[in-house]
């Protein structure tokens, strides 16, 4: 099982969204205090919809508490300062992928101690960072892709049928089918 770690998250809606993503991906969520909200706040639950009760999560008092309770864990740390691009590393089945708080990321002293396992998402232009929920989803689904989507619930056949029916295509002839095939080829589905 993959593990997502949020170090001192500040925005409840981001954490709720990430919780929902973890449920969908079959990943465990680790939350390291202090957090900028209470875990039972409405904004956390609202962003996680009705999936929060299905989420496997643990809350830790501090970063040292997290390390003590997860000895020997392989931890990748997402930061804009990393040399390694997230898609260039091989994510192990039970690894941990850590993200820092929205306003400051992972503290420099932690990154220095773990330089070899820091990863980044490439960005263009004058952007300082991506939204935390988006960043988690990008890296988590790359790790799942590398592992062959081990807990996937569907082969996509029913989803393709539903998409075709939703567009009123019926037998999927013509341009729509070309677009679907392009999309699937582009995203390697």
Predicted segment positions?
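Post-transcriptional modification and biogenesis factors for structured RNAs
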Residues: 1-189
